[in-house]
């Protein structure tokens, strides 16, 4: 199998990252969405397919109803998921899946039935020669060059904190909150409404997402930043809308991601903050490994891309950790693709060859083989 290039596919709630093992970055990055016309006549004479996938669905989203097959990190609609994989292989990567070993990623605590369903679809629908399913956070840790640490992985649909010791996640200490990128986009839209800008349709929320990604940052000291924003215009930035109109945003730039640190105060949600989530996960682990975890807090995923987030998380964790411990937060510049890169690295190792689930393994044991070979 060594002569067949491995396809690495990281399926996120919001974005699919796909490419080939051994490369530094994914070849294809596209929205994890399926779009169907709201009413068929709206698209007649344009290009009336019954459904659109990825970037094309994104471009036409004004006239489409958008479906996300992955919700909060977990596949909920297998028919649409199969379409996304089909699109990944044949359109984005332009490969025949039966000619390539496939590495798929999964959320921590992915239900057993889901792991089996992924395995079944890959071998039976796509006829792949070999498969491996890896936990996203473990791959992020590998991409940071470590085998022990705690990964705070915040994507579009869910945020996880996953303690990992010597390459294995510690399942009982994994924590998750349903607060991630999509929630921050909606929250920013709410904040902009207070300024008199209304963004409500799905196409308009895409604009808000772009504003969020380009202009938002995390304040090291929120109260101080808020006071400064009242006293001066230093945080104000302009943003040009697609129609050429220019809007100004100020304190919203740091009030939006503050939601991660103060979910109750900012938006009335009784959830753990990302600092409490991280601290709780570490405290759930054996006392002997805690120091190693505090010294290797790895940020991963698109929702950790805000400027200032690493410094703020460090400050918050230092306030909670034992004073004798030197806390360290690692925020690599390309952490948006950390999971994918970890998969690319892992499958390139010569020692990985024995880890694949082969077609023979599947034929002999069925889908449950995934629980034995992909721990």
From Swiss-Prot:
Q: Please give the chief subcellular localization of this protein.
A: cytoplasm
Under the heading InterPro entries, the entry gives: Actin, Actin/actin-like_CS, Actin_CS, ATPase_NBD
Indicate whether Hydrolase appears among the record's keywords: yes
Catalytic activity from the UniProt record: ATP + H2O = ADP + phosphate + H(+)
- Which PROSITE patterns does this entry report, sorted A to Z? ACTINS_1, ACTINS_2, ACTINS_ACT_LIKE
Any single GO molecular-function term of the entry would be: ATP binding
Q: What does this protein do?
A: Actins are highly conserved proteins that are involved in various types of cell motility and are ubiquitously expressed in all eukaryotic cells.
Protein name as it appears in the record: Actin, cytoplasmic
Q: What is the lineage of its organism?
A: Eukaryota, Sar, Alveolata, Ciliophora, Intramacronucleata
């Amino acid at each position: 199998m060594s002569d067949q290039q491995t396809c690495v596919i990281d399926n996120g709630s919001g974005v699919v990252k796909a490419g080939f093992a051994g490369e530094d970055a994914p070849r294809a990055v596209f929205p994890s969405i399926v779009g169907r016309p709201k009413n068929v006549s709206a698209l007649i004479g344009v290009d009336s397919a019954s459904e659109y996938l990825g970037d094309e669905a994104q471009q036409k989203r004004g006239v489409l109803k958008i479906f996300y097959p992955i919700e909060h990190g977990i596949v909920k609609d297998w028919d649409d998921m199969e379409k996304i994989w089909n699109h990944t292989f044949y359109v984005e990567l332009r490969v025949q899946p039966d000619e390539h070993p496939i590495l798929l990623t999964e959320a921590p605590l992915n239900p057993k039935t889901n792991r089996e369903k992924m395995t079944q679809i890959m071998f039976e629908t796509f006829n792949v020669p070999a498969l491996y399913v890896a936990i996203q956070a473990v791959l992020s840790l590998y991409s940071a060059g470590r085998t022990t640490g705690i990964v705070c992985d915040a994507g579009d649909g869910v945020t996880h904190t996953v303690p990992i010791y010597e390459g294995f996640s510690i399942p009982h200490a994994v924590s998750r909150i349903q607060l991630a990128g999509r929630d921050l986009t909606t929250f920013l839209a709410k904040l902009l409404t207070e300024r008199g800008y209304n963004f409500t349709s799905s196409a308009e929320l895409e604009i808000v997402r772009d504003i969020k990604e380009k202009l938002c940052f995390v304040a090291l000291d929120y109260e101080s930043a808020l006071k400064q924003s009242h006293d001066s215009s230093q945080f104000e930035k302009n943003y040009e809308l697609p129609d050429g109109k220019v809007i100004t945003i100020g304190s919203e730039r740091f009030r939006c991601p503050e939601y991660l640190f103060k979910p109750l105060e900012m938006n009335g949600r009784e959830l753990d903050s990302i600092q409490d989530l991280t601290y709780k996960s570490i405290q759930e682990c054996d006392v002997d490994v805690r120091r190693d975890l505090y010294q290797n807090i790895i940020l991963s995923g698109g929702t950790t891309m805000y400027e200032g987030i690493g410094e703020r998380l460090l400050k918050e964790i230092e306030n909670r950790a034992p004073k004798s411990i030197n806390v360290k937060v690692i925020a690599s510049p390309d952490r948006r693709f950390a999971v994918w890169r970890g998969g690319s690295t892992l499958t390139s190792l010569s020692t990985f060859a024995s880890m694949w689930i082969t077609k023979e393994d599947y034929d002999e044991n069925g889908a449950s083989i995934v629980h034995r070979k992909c721990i």
